[in-house]
Amino acid sequence: MPFRFALLLALALTALPAAAQPSMPPPVQAGPLRLQAAAAGSAPISLDGRLDEAVWATAAPASGFVQNRPTPGAPASQPTEARVLYSDDAIYVGMRMADSNAGAIAAPLGRRDSDLPSDLAYVVLDSYHDRRTAFLFGVNPVGVKLDKLFYDDGNSQDDSWDAIWDVVTSRDAGGWTAEFRIPLGQLRYTPGNETWGVEFGRVIQRTGEEAMWAPVLPNDTGFVGLFGELTGLVGLGSPRRLEVVPYVSAQAVRAPDTRAPGGPADPYYASTDLAPRAGVDLKLGLSSNLTLTATVNPDFGQVEADPAQVNLGGFELFLQERRPFFVEGIDVFSFGRARRYFSNNRPQLLYTRRIGRSPQRQGFVPSDASDEAGEQGVVYTDAPQQTTILGAAKVSGRIGPVTLGVLSAVTAPEYGRYSAYDGTGAPVTDGRGLVEPTSSYSVLRARTTLGRTIVGAAGTLVLRDLSDPAFPGLMPRQASVLEVDVEHRLSPEWIASGLIAGSAVTGSREAIVGLQRAFPRLYQRPDAGHLGVDSTRTSLTGLTGEIALQKAGGEHWLGSVSAAFTSPGFDANDLGFQSRADDINGGVVVIYNQNTPRGWYRSWGGNAYAGLGTNFDGDLRNAFTGLEGNVGFANFWNANASLGANARTVDDRLTRGGVLALSPAGMEFNIGGSTDGRRRLRGNSYVYGSANEIGSRSIGIEVGATLRPAPNVEVGLYPGVSTGHVERQFVTAFNDPAAAGTFGRRTVFAESDQSEFSMSTRVNWTFTPTLSLQLFARPFVSRGRYAAFKEPTAPRQLVFPTVEEAGGTAVQAADGSVTVTPGDGGRPYTVSPDFTVRALQGNAVLRWEYRPGSALFVVWQQQRDGFEGDGRSPFGLNLGRLARDPLQNVFLVKLTYWFG
């Protein structure tokens, strides 16, 4: 480890505790509040939102709520009471929200789990009573449900978690009431445990107030661990937990005809492609603490498509997981991160988007498929866009003191078809080629608490059937990762954590060479003293690790210091997401928050951060520092700003396997703000920019406006535009012995002017809490123009000489292509890098939950795509051309039915 790296960490470790001393001693923590639950008895409880059954009077009330915001620690401005009953099969919660101005209660309609500007009442149950995991059930005054799962003591949450439960509300002149029925089968608990953790909360939208029964203040450490206790749950057994949700769907795809005029008929083209499907989801309680969730032939047609993007860098784009099976209950599979505030681009050890990914083999047509046709031969192909998931299963819950999670999925082999024709249109050959092999994906996660220490372990495994002779050279046969992590609470505010993980990938020599040369590693770099491609290897192994010290609570000061490494051979990309290996980095963050409202502000805060990183050869890759600040005004507007700077360092990725280059010093900034979120019309804006010492620069703005013209309708418009100039934009690279100064590898760059425009539009129309229509449209245009072609002529250059400065020529043809003749006698080459990419994405989703757990989806999706080898046309013209670009429509009807 370089001396400067060690020095920074040593200074950070000594400085952070001193800076983090609170301005006053923390208050002494009293014992938890307690609430006695009452037995519901044999008389039926009518779920009507009135709490008029006599049994409700036998339950003790929880009252005396305390504000979390806007005045932390102050008594709630309006009285609230909560009571709990229990029966053999359910928990009942009654909440009464008194309001002296009941006519001002905010009660808009929206979809379940939507972020509404609304009053809200909720109960949170820590049924494990582990002070780390809890289930939230909430409702607004007109019956819009909200449920979510908290884990890691509330530091993380799963908003996609949807349970099967009921709630009814009522309103009167004195306020409103909510009556919940939560089946025991939807919770996880240990039979015989008569005490759970519990929290009750209420939001009053017009005043921006949130109050809770067991006080949770902004300066507190944790969330679930601060709950009160629900006692008296006598005789809770293990209810039957079996849920079966079959589905049937029908999808019709109308695709454009892109054949050349007069060409042979495409045997795979159909104006409308019909595809019926059926499958089933299953949830089975193996015990009161352990659940099996499975899906067979899953369908995710109702999930919104990924936004269009243009990737001009070598890094893979990270795509958000949206598929319900892989999002719900993912808390158990959270691992691979130490507790810190510093963002250090660590490998993500589990990335479920790998399951069911796009097929990886592109060139599946044999090279001689159209030999008989000569130059006039035409080849038509048809390949799937996604890999079919045959089935997947999760087991999650607890076995004694151990929290356990197991995930397994199997994907089908996928084949592409091809047909070749001669110049007369007569078929020459017809065949198919494997584009994705049969694969299995497995994840195991376990953790347990030992006093103030949490110890965990995890493993991932990918196995592929590579018996097809075309595949062993394309991808590994087997890939695994093993991880061990530990977290120790030194005090209520201080947490030390760390992890170590190892990876092992095996496959053919060609596959392992591909991994060595891939962008995260680039073993082929000619001036890397510690790396080199080994073409005889059939495996690749490596390690990654991280340690961190975090101050996670306190009246004002928070912070963390952390250090991490990833060895050159570590690879988690078969079931994870990793943008680079060969990395050592560290950083420190010091945070100050003021959460007590005074005068013109409700809260304000800021942080300072610094970090640096090297590779294993000791090259300083980055060194940066910055400041961030935010303020919440008394009128409920918000503002934030940041300013960052980085020093001149070394870039070992810019040339994509070529020589090292210097990375210029630069600065970046952003300024943002938002208006009062309680209003019918609310907005936000975000301006960002950057510049560096060699002349690269960028500026962008994103704005948003959301209007609620009626209580059940919300319209949002979110345009964004950016423009920039890049002095060193990668174009291409190839071997050329004449490029002696760069070890026979010629890497071509250019100056590039780039700009992008997008505008997302959303309409949410809610007819009832269970019937809604969502509309979405997003046009997208990205342009790039290239000039002043240049090449590095030696390692560690900051400014690359242009082709003309190096004695060569660059001649542009009428079609926009540029032919470059190097001045060192190398072979000429031609490039056509200018581009305009257009896309229009739209969808409409009608969702009707016609009974709890059962839904009907009617979906329409539209996609238009266009490309031009010209980056000069204005945005307005390109938006007009979108109307003429090839169009694909997808229509889907999906019906699910819940048995349980």
Residue ranges with predicted function:
Residues 1-5:
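Positively charged n-region of N-terminal signal peptides that target proteins for export
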Residues 89-91, 133, 176, 192-196, ...:
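Outer-envelope beta-barrel architecture signal
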Residues 269-270, 313, 383, 430-437, ...:
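Alpha-helix capping and helix-loop boundary segments enriched in small/acidic/polar residues
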Residues 217-238, 416-479, 487-490, 551-554, ...:
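Outer-membrane beta-barrel transmembrane domain signature of Gram-negative proteins
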Residues 20-449, 456-457, 466, 885:
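Structural preference for beta-rich elements and adjacent junctions enriched in aromatics
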Residues 6-15:
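Bacterial N-terminal signal peptides
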Residues 388, 499-900:
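Exposed, low-structure sequence patches enriched in small/polar residues
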Residues 238-293, 441-531, 589-591, 596, ...:
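Surface-exposed extracellular loop regions of Gram-negative outer-membrane beta-barrel proteins
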